[in-house]
Amino acid sequence: MRFINSSFTDAGFNLAAEEYLLKQGTEDVFMLWQSAPSVIIGKHQRVETEVNRTMAEQNKIPVFRRFSGGGAVYHDLGNINLTFIETTRLARFETYLERTVEMLTAAGVAVRGDERLGIYVDGRKVSGSAQCVHRNRAMYHCTLLYDTNLVLLNKLLEVEGLEEKVAVHLSLIHISEPTR
């Protein structure tokens, strides 16, 4: 497995690198990366229902769409992003969660994973993930919050008037879990 420790903090660059490595690469890859403040939404999400655009514009925080599913996430230099890309006949995304939990446990962090592939410390969600498959290649990527600006995270991912939009766009809204 090839290890890539990306020194680029542009979320758009790192997301494009993931997509290239998945679709054009042949090697199995483990990539670590961080992003300057940014919001990343899933492939099937609507910006209007996931991101407080006014807050993003006021803080000059770009919004990117990734090519995998999953919910909206906030990135800054206080979180680490992990990407696993492998050639496989059968993608078992739980395996990547297990690897991440084992790594954190070995580092002395008491964590637990759940059936939705989230990771928790003391009952608080510190990691969410998204997955996708392209031909015979699978990708699992996740965030790991450790010193993230949670005030900004919660303001950016809190959309006013969402209740009215839920009835119209229910299929495009993710199941949110508060990050404390």
PLM region spans:
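DPxDG-like acidic metal-binding loop motif
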Residues: 74-86, 137-138
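Active-site loop/lid in soluble adenylation, ligation, and acyl-transfer enzymes
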Residues: 1-48, 131, 156-158, 176
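Residue-level detector of conserved catalytic or cofactor/ligand-binding positions
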Residues: 171-180
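Long, well-ordered alpha-helical scaffolding segments within enzyme catalytic domains
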Residues: 90-106
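Short, His- and charge-rich active-site/binding loops that engage polyanionic ligands
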Residues: 45-65
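Phosphate/diphosphate-binding glycine-rich loops and adjacent basic-rich segments that engage nucleotide
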Residues: 135-137, 142-172
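A glycine-rich, hydrophobic loop/mini-helix early in the fold
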Residues: 59-80
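Beta-rich nucleic-acid/ligand-interaction surfaces
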Residues: 113-131
